[in-house]
A protein has these predicted regions:
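A conserved ligand/cofactor-binding region detector
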Residues: 2-184
């Protein structure tokens, strides 16, 4: 799009591993994980000031809000991760257009639950960390089983939720009426 002189803004997931890297070993082709971020990536800019919280699951409780004179919706019982944006410039060919690709990394809200660990619940102690890691670890998990389908859905929901939150926050900085968002 940048080469065609279109201003655009893309979003995706900052996967830690690509699908695979091919190597020849003992005369045979083998596939190994592609750890493309092992040495960092110089063309990306970490933007923690624009981090978003993404919720999975839970339920919504409705209660009356006397200040607003209406209903208030409260999301509870969910799992959450922090979506950290990394911005990458996408330059056009033979023009001055530079677009942005924002890719989201997932981090735990709480790194380690010492209380759970001390009680012997080792799985719960690292649950947040594992949820975040699983979302961004590998591009296209095998989804021929339930766990793979669930992870792919979480990955898609993760980057859509973070991207929409960012777009709405950016809109609200300059505009008061959210009902006119469609005009922009």
């Amino acid at each position: 799009l940048a080469t065609l002189n279109y201003a655009a803004y893309g979003c995706g997931i900052r996967y830690h591993y690509g699908m695979f890297k091919q190597k020849i070993q003992n005369g045979y082709q083998i596939e190994v994980p592609d750890n493309w971020l092992k040495n960092g990536y110089p063309f990306e800019l970490r933007r923690p000031e624009y981090a978003k919280e993404v919720h999975f699951g839970g339920y919504v409780r409705v209660e009356y809000d006397p200040e607003k004179g209406g209903s208030k919706f409260i999301h509870e019982g969910y799992q959450a991760v922090k979506a950290i944006p990394y911005d990458m410039p996408i330059t056009g060919y033979d023009n001055d257009v530079v677009n942005t690709l924002r890719i989201w990394d997932a981090e735990p809200i709480v790194d380690f639950e010492l209380d759970s660990f001390d009680k012997g619940d080792y799985k719960k102690a690292v649950e947040q960390e594992n949820l975040a890691r699983n979302i961004v670890e590998v591009l296209y998990p095998n989804d021929n089983h339930y766990a793979g389908k669930e992870l792919r859905l979480k990955q898609q929901y993760f980057f859509v939720s973070a991207s929409l939150q960012a777009a709405i926050a950016k809109y609200k900085k300059k505009h008061d009426d959210i009902h006119k968002l469609y005009e922009k």
